[in-house]
Amino acid sequence: MDVGSKEVLMESPPDYTAVPGGRLLIPCCPVNIKRLLIVVVVVVLVVVVIVGALLMGLHMSQKHTEMVLEMSITGPEAQQRLALSERVGTTATFSIGSTGTVVYDYQRLLIAYKPAPGTCCYIMKMAPQNIPSLEALTRKLQNFQAKPQVPSSKLGQEQGHDAGSAFSGDLAFLGRTVSTLCGEVPLYYT
């Protein structure tokens, strides 16, 4: 071993001091790449925070919508569900909570109401200029059901049937939607 190599080992160790100025030094990277890397990391963090906030808002909105829908379905107030038939604009069907179903037939100018127990069906004529709203119709039908009177005329009486018999004729003149709703129960014209 020669003496020169021992001197190298005997030198004092290098100083390990803090980075001057508090800067982050990434070895073997030029300054412009370091700046670009810092900008990219900041932009990615901002995007992640924004996307997270949007997803939380969407989740809260979805939960609120589901809660409102569930309350409207199971709630005591009237549920008004509109279902149009194959011929758009000719019939509209409304389910009025647990009290019954109303069908507006705009082609035949008829309104059919079947109470929830399904013991009878009421048919009304409507004027094309004065179509009653669902609220007005519901009030009228609830008042009509509250009275213990006999319905004004049974739909078989006009053809010579007595008041106690059920009308067993062809219901095609009522249309498919009203016939489906009222086909198996006595019909009353109000």
From Swiss-Prot:
The keyword Translocase does not apply. Residues 94-190 form the BRICHOS domain. Keywords: Disulfide bond, Gaseous exchange, Lipoprotein, Palmitate, Secreted, Surface film. InterPro entries: BRICHOS_dom, SP-C, SP-C_palmitoylation_site, Surfactant_protein_propep. One of its GO terms (biological process) is respiratory gaseous exchange by respiratory system. A lipid is attached at residues 28-29 (S-palmitoyl cysteine). It holds the Pfam family SP_C-Propep. Disulfide bonds join 121-182. It comes from the Eukaryota. Its main location: secreted. GO terms for cellular component: alveolar lamellar body; extracellular space. It is found in: Secreted, Extracellular space, Surface film. Residues 1-24, 59-190 form a propeptide. Pulmonary surfactant associated proteins promote alveolar stability by lowering the surface tension at the air-liquid interface in the peripheral air spaces. Pulmonary surfactant consists of 90% lipid and 10% protein. There are 4 surfactant-associated proteins: 2 collagenous, carbohydrate-binding glycoproteins (SP-A and SP-D) and 2 small hydrophobic proteins (SP-B and SP-C). This is Surfactant protein C. The gene is SFTPC.
